[in-house]
C-alpha cells in the first residue's frame, strides 16, 4: 500500500540525494531507480506522476530538477556512480554496473522531460 504518491516521493528522494553527505547518497540515488523500476503500474506512471509535480508547482521541484541535471544525466556523473556502488558494492565495475548507471541516466532524462 503506497504511503505517498510517486511524484512527491521522487522529489523527496532526489532532494535527499542533493542535501546528504556520505554513504546515504548512494542509497538515495539507487532508490530513485528502484522506485521507477518497481512501480506496479509501470515506469511510465512514475514518470507521469513526476511530471504532475511540475504542473502542481511543487516547492521542492526546482532543486530536484537541478539535481537531476547536475548529477544524473551521464553515466559518469555522481548519481549513477553512487547508485552502482551502493547496489553492487565491490562489484561496481563491469557490465552490470554500466547497465545500472545507464538505466539511471535514462530515468533522469525521462523525469527531466516529463
Model-predicted regions and their roles:
Residues 1-59, 64-70, 74, 78-87, ...:
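Catalytic cores of NTP-dependent nucleotidyl/adenyl transfer enzymes across multiple folds
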Residues 92:
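Acidic, glycine-rich loop-and-beta core segments that form the ion-binding/anion-interacting portion
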